[in-house]
Curated annotation (Swiss-Prot):
Keywords: Isomerase
Annotated protein name in UniProt: Ribose-5-phosphate isomerase A
Lineage of the organism: Bacteria, Bacillati, Bacillota, Bacilli, Lactobacillales
Ranges in a coiled coil: none
Function: Catalyzes the reversible conversion of ribose-5-phosphate to ribulose 5-phosphate.
Reactions that this protein is recorded to catalyse: aldehydo-D-ribose 5-phosphate = D-ribulose 5-phosphate
One of the record's GO cellular component terms: cytosol
NCBIfam families tied to this protein: PRK00702.1 (NF001924), rpiA (TIGR00021)
GO biological process, one term: D-ribose metabolic process
Enzyme class: isomerase
Record gene name: rpiA
Enzyme Commission (EC) number: 5.3.1.6
Pathway the protein contributes to: Carbohydrate degradation; pentose phosphate pathway; D-ribose 5-phosphate from D-ribulose 5-phosphate (non-oxidative stage): step 1/1
Length: 226
């Protein structure tokens, strides 16, 4: 069992009968969704899933997990998702899988969020992983120029075919290569106020628990209340 599978299975233990569960996206979240699907089938676990991408929706439906959209539920009890980086003070960068907008919407309306990662994702400071910024296609080149002038080293994300990537929401992604983010809240606020920016991959003050995979087993970190 690899570290991603280990934390995915561990996180699925927190899912209880009757819950509305946000199902994350990505290589680690995939194992969590598989385990929830197994529990639905083998244990009779009764939940409703809310997916964060078309990719996860397809996986969950194939596993027989009942689904509703975020607009069909009053709230989400628990969201479990991966992360690309988690800092020492439990702030995160997400969006390497291009699902950041829907992931952030589901997380925002969740009572509790668990992030599942292998040990390599735990860092002192955010920024070594490129920061995704989801933008409206119209005017996106202007934002690239703006970010270049700011010294953010932007790149427009491409898909496997080498064409401009289109997100599930119909947007583009500009990745910012920042190396180190000294003030995530200030940067997040700046990006929030830019015309044409739909969302960014800074997930600040959102997570309740982090499950980290190590060779000797998963370690659960409880995030202090903010």
């Amino acid at each position: 069992m690899n570290l991603k599978q280990m934390v995915g299975i561990e996180a699925a233990k927190y899912v209880e009968d009757g819950m509305i569960v946000g199902l994350g996206t990505g290589s680690t979240a995939k194992f969590m969704v598989d385990e929830i699907g197994r529990r639905v089938k083998e244990e009779g676990l009764s939940i409703v899933g809310v997916t964060t991408s078309k990719e996860t929706e397809k996986q969950a439906l194939a596993l027989g997990i009942p689904l509703k959209s975020i607009d069909e539920v009053p709230y989400v009890d628990l969201t479990i998702d991966g992360a690309d980086e988690i800092s020492a003070d439990f702030q995160g960068i997400k969006g390497g899988g291009a699902a950041l907008l829907f992931e952030k919407i589901v997380a925002t309306y969740s009572k509790k969020c668990i992030w599942i990662v292998d040990k390599s994702k735990m860092v002192d400071d955010l920024g070594a992983f490129p920061l995704p910024v989801e933008v409206v296609p119209y005017g996106s080149r202007q934002l690239v120029h703006l970010f270049e002038e700011k010294g953010y080293h932007p790149t427009l994300r491409l898909n496997a075919a080498g064409e401009t990537l289109i997100t599930d929401g119909g947007h583009h992604i500009i990745d910012l290569h920042l190396e180190k983010i000294t003030d995530p809240e200030a940067l997040g606020s700046y990006l929030d106020n830019l015309v044409g920016v739909v969302e960014h991959g800074l997930f600040l003050n959102m997570v309740s628990m982090v499950i980290v995979g190590y060779e000797d087993g998963p370690k659960t970190l409880h995030v202090p209340a903010r």
